[in-house]
Amino acid sequence: MDTEACVEQAKRIIDAGGEYVRLTTQGVREAENLKNINIGLRSQGYDTPLVADVHFNPKVADVAAQYAEKVRINPGNYVDPGRTFRKLEYTDEEYAQEIEKIRARFIPFLNICKENHTAIRIGVNHGSLSDRIMSHYGDTPEGMVESCMEFLRICVAEHFNDVVISIKASNTVVMVRTVRLLVKEMEKEGMAFPLHLGVTEAGDGEDGRIKSALGIGALLADGLGDTIRVSLSEAPENEIPVARKLVDYILTREGHPFIPGKEAPQFNYLSPGRRKTKAVRNIGGDNLPVVIADVWKGLSKLILSSNLTIFIAVEVCPNHEITI
């Protein structure tokens, strides 16, 4: 454990604009050291909340709840064993007993959080669903949602409301669909917990930024999401400007005149299909999708005033081009 390094990294994140800092908390020693990190930051005038990220060991979450403002737990490995890709079979009674095991371990943790005024994040990951969930639901958005809902129902029954939810995947299509499905399921059961958005393993550089913008941006445009994290394989402070740009873009759309909506009867919000369009030469209809590049302003006059042929590349074949 390097307390000083953690404090310095947290300061860089906060100075870049981070509104809270998440720290990986592998074991009990690391959880107890959150106290020292908190003291180190507060002594230098930083009062930004700390979030402990806990996997595999519920005891670590119990300790972390005493020193962090929020604790993230992963339903895929909080009580259920880590993922081994075993196919498990349960009777209805046996499955209900597995849920009771979760209740028996989770409720004492909630009580510790109540005593210490600690919030929790129920953070589901597509890549770490338990064997129990995988065996019952498969590797599906429905399984991810149910993994989260099992814990939310316990929170509701125990009148614990200081909860944030995240439900992430590295595949942006899966991530967007799953969050939308989760919101729908919460509405069915009268729940309205805040959402934390993010794309796992987005990568670095331009690719990581584009991937995060696609997943997070689509949901923000839906009006979903309360906090976000752009996960880049770079220094953590590099994530903040990207997140800020996404939020600022959405905020520019605030305050516009109300536009009454009209439901499209053929449109499935959770599983949108390709829209039917009229073909204009080789675009639309049953033609393959084409990619049209945005032209830099400095070159647009040159291109339009010349006799250059404009090409549009078809996505499917790398070396295939068509002229329009």
Positions of the model-derived regions?
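Glycine-rich tight-turn/loop motif centered on a GG-T
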Residues: 44-45, 68-105, 132-143
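N-terminal active-site wall of soluble small-molecule enzyme domains
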Residues: 25-67, 299-301, 319-320
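Glycine-rich, proline-tolerant flexible connector loops at the mouths of alpha/beta enzymes
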Residues: 5, 14-41, 75-97, 163-172, ...
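Active-site mouth loops of central-metabolism enzymes
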Residues: 1-8, 26, 48-57, 132-145, ...
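Catalytic alpha/beta core domains of metabolic enzymes, predominantly
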Residues: 92-102, 133-284
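Hydrophobic faces of well-ordered beta-strands that scaffold small-molecule active sites
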Residues: 1, 19-23, 48-54, 71-73, ...
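Active-site beta-loop-alpha junctions enriched in small/polar residues
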Residues: 26-28, 53-59, 74-78, 123-129, ...
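Alpha-helix-loop-beta-strand connector modules within alpha/beta enzyme cores
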Residues: 30-52, 100-117, 146, 150, ...
